[in-house]
Amino acid sequence: MKKWILRVVAGFFLLIALFVLGLYIASGGAKGKGYHEASVVINKPAVAIFPWLTDPGKQKEWIFGLAESKPLTEGGLRVGARSQEIMLVGEEQTVMESEVTALDPNKLMAVKVTSEGFDGDIRYALEEAGASTTLRYTGDFRYRPFMLRLLEPLITPSAQRKLEGDLMKLKSVVEAGQ
């Protein structure tokens, strides 16, 4: 009887080990790991959209979970400007520091993001076509702790869904003229 219980327990731990190994292999070899991209066509000119990307008060209206954004440098929005963002999703709080790495008002903004668990590069590009503008977002994130790297195959699709929801919310508030 004891041998049977030991075999079941050993088999259970073996299955868990295989699952963890599979996630580890998937996170190490997944093409585009930590990479997100999405675009949305907004029926407004770029000049009406850009403030929603740069104004902390407006960002809170469309970025789910953004609780706070405060500048860490003076001089307004410019290359080199830094800010701190606090994201709250459920009970989980993430503190991030952002630095503007490229800026062309109403056309482009790129930001480097750092936090305890990850680093990332985000790029917003606006392209006008007639009365509408296509906003293209790309984000490339690198997870530092082993556990986050292991869970990357689960994190990235979830982050992609959040991104797509946020961009649809942005489209809605900008087009409503709020």
Regions found by a protein language model. Give the residues of each.
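A short, structured loop/turn motif at beta-sheet edges
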Residues: 43-47, 74-79, 101-107, 125-134, ...
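Short beta-edge strand/loop motif at the mouth of beta-sheet-based domains
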Residues: 57-95, 103-108
